[in-house]
């Protein structure tokens, strides 16, 4: 893992995307990124969706630098600086409490960071969460920082603290003004519910018009519904969702997931001026899910939407193939039909005439660009193979990222 010079160090890690089923929207402290309500998420498997980050430090580096998906970005970005400051503070604290100087590196060294996503950035696929979780985790490996990294990741992106763990994760809003108790914790491991499957319906890979940071700040300032949601709705939903997950109650899990997604987007519409992250295709998907469930006579599929038009679908293994066929029927692939489904393999099935009639949709060719099939997955991982490094020995990107 280390580079050739013993005083330098290079580490590469991966981190997952998480999808909230009880949504986080709104901060009570913009600087510390403290939420107005707790939230709960599902960690997606890194075989399909991940961020890979390499961090290198060297006495030869003259400044901190960062490359995202092959492009050099402004290292002075406030949230990035907050992460770096926090991890260096923890590293200094660790060093001062140990006997002697056990760390073979200097905290004064500059850092180079390269990070790549294998999914569309800023299109509502929680790229900032995976990115900052990966940054925090990789920096911690470099600086020898142990323990909970919620505070480091949270300073970059609030929901990033949930990507520090696999399985099902709760971000506790906390009560302290300094945010020390605003941390993520795993409520069930990734192997807890093996039948659960996730489908990401990519409607648009374009960058969203209203970013999450600006959007939620406006909502906090103007939406009375958001205040009611945070204080009177979410606390009980957190308990109920935790129960549904622990008991593998898919009906309860699915219905609550959809209701919470709907309420989140209702608070966006209650914001002034209103924010709309969903588009016509998003709304068609919502309609499709409800008609599919009605035909089945029970809730077999659930949708949730973050701050973007892409749908995340939760279902069980025995329903995946039929629902994918329903999506193909409703949103026929415009081209490259063989690339319409990515990720886990899903066997093709034919829809019954009864289900086609129940869906009663006017086909919308190309409305869904592609589907990513995945499952619940683990938290961040260290990559031990030096061939995985995104930076060369000179500390610069060593390949086309």
Swiss-Prot record:
Known EC number: 4.1.1.33
Modified residues (N-acetylalanine): 2
Catalytic activity of the protein: (R)-5-diphosphomevalonate + ATP = isopentenyl diphosphate + ADP + phosphate + CO2
Record key words, sorted: Acetylation, ATP-binding, Cholesterol biosynthesis, Cholesterol metabolism, Cytoplasm, Lipid biosynthesis, Lipid metabolism, Lyase, Nucleotide-binding, Steroid biosynthesis, Steroid metabolism, Sterol biosynthesis, Sterol metabolism
Its job: Catalyzes the ATP dependent decarboxylation of (R)-5-diphosphomevalonate to form isopentenyl diphosphate (IPP). Functions in the mevalonate (MVA) pathway leading to isopentenyl diphosphate (IPP), a key precursor for the biosynthesis of isoprenoids and sterol synthesis.
Subunit structure: Homodimer.
Protein name: Diphosphomevalonate decarboxylase
Organism: Mus musculus
Organism phylogeny: Eukaryota, Metazoa, Chordata, Craniata, Vertebrata
Gene, per the UniProt record: Mvd
């Amino acid at each position: 893992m280390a580079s050739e010079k013993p005083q330098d160090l290079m580490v590469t890690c991966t981190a997952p995307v998480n999808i909230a089923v009880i949504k986080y929207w709104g901060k009570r402290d913009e600087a510390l990124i403290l939420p107005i309500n707790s939230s709960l998420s599902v960690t997606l498997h890194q075989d399909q969706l991940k961020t890979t980050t390499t961090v290198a430090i060297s006495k030869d580096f003259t400044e901190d630098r960062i490359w995202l998906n092959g492009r050099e970005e402004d290292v002075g970005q406030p949230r990035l600086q907050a992460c770096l400051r926090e991890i260096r503070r923890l590293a200094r604290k660790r060093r001062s409490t140990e006997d002697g100087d056990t760390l073979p590196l200097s905290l004064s060294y500059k850092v180079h960071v390269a990070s790549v996503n294998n999914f569309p950035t800023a299109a509502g696929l929680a790229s900032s969460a995976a990115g900052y979780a990966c940054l925090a985790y990789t920096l911690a490996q470099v600086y020898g920082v142990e323990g909970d990294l919620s505070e480091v990741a949270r300073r970059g992106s609030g929901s990033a603290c949930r990507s520090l763990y696999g399985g099902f994760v709760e971000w506790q809003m906390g009560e302290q003004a300094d945010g020390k108790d605003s941390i993520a914790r795993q409520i069930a491991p990734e192997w807890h519910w093996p039948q659960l499957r996730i489908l990401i319906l990519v409607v648009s890979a374009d960058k969203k018009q209203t970013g999450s940071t600006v959007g939620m700040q406006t909502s906090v300032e103007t939406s009375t519904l958001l205040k009611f949601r945070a204080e009177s709705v979410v606390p009980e939903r957190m308990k109920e969702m935790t129960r549904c997950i622990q008991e593998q109650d898919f009906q309860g899990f699915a219905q609550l997931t959809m209701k919470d997604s709907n309420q989140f987007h209702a608070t966006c519409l209650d914001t002034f001026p209103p924010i709309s992250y969903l588009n016509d295709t998003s709304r068609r998907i919502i309609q499709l899910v409800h008609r599919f469930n009605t035909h089945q006579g029970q809730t077999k599929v659930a949708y949730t939407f973050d701050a973007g038009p892409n749908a995340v679908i939760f279902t069980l293994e025995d329903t995946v193939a039929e629902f994918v066929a329903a999506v193909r029927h409703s949103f026929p692939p415009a081209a490259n039909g063989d690339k319409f489904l990515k990720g886990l393999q899903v066997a093709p099935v034919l829809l019954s005439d009864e289900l086609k009639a129940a869906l009663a949709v006017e086909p919308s060719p190309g409305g869904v660009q592609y589907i990513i099939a995945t499952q619940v997955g683990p938290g961040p991982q260290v990559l031990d193979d030096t061939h995985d490094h995104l930076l060369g020995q000179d500390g610069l990107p060593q390949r086309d990222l």
